């Protein structure tokens, strides 16, 4: 009986130590830039939208929809909203009838688009 209590006590201590170690664990210092990049530009559509605006900016919603094949209206509007909130896009709404909204790359978005140019150059070399 005493052996079982001792085993249970040791097991509980190990579990407590393991939980404390997990709580203290933080992402590795060198993974933080990648984590941030993936949080603002990750996903299936955001980089495609940034690339489309890099090719021709500013652009209206329908123009972006035609330049990003097979994206749904819901995903395009959600991605545009998130990219704007994260500071990668600028949204300009004109007080006209009918209403007009244009999206353009912000300075942060333009610097990311420059990196996409390097990715495109890498792709051309890798396919040879």
Model-identified regions with their sequence ranges:
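A short, conserved structural fragment
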Residues: 84-92
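Short, solvent-exposed amphipathic helices
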Residues: 111-127
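Basic, amphipathic "hinge/linker" alpha-helix immediately C-terminal to the N-terminal HTH DNA-binding motif
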Residues: 95-116
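N-terminal leader segment of winged-helix/HTH proteins
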Residues: 1-41
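A cross-family signal for key residues in well-ordered alpha-helices
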Residues: 35, 51, 78, 114, ...
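Basic amphipathic alpha-helical segments that dock to polyanions
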Residues: 76, 80-83
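N-terminal helix-turn-helix DNA-binding core of bacterial DNA-binding proteins
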Residues: 28-75, 96, 102
């Amino acid at each position: 009986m005493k052996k079982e209590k001792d085993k249970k006590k040791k097991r509980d201590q190990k579990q407590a130590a393991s939980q404390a170690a997990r709580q203290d664990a933080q992402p590795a210092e060198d993974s933080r830039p990648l984590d941030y990049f993936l949080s603002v530009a990750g996903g299936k559509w955001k980089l495609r939208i940034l690339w489309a605006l890099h090719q021709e900016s500013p652009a209206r919603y329908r123009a972006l929809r035609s330049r990003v094949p097979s994206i749904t209206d819901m995903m395009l509007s959600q991605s545009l909203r998130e990219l704007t909130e994260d500071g990668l896009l600028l949204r300009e709404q004109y007080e006209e009838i009918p209403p007009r909204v244009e999206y353009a790359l912000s300075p942060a978005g333009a610097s990311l688009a420059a990196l996409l140019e390097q990715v495109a150059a890498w792709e051309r070399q890798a396919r040879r």
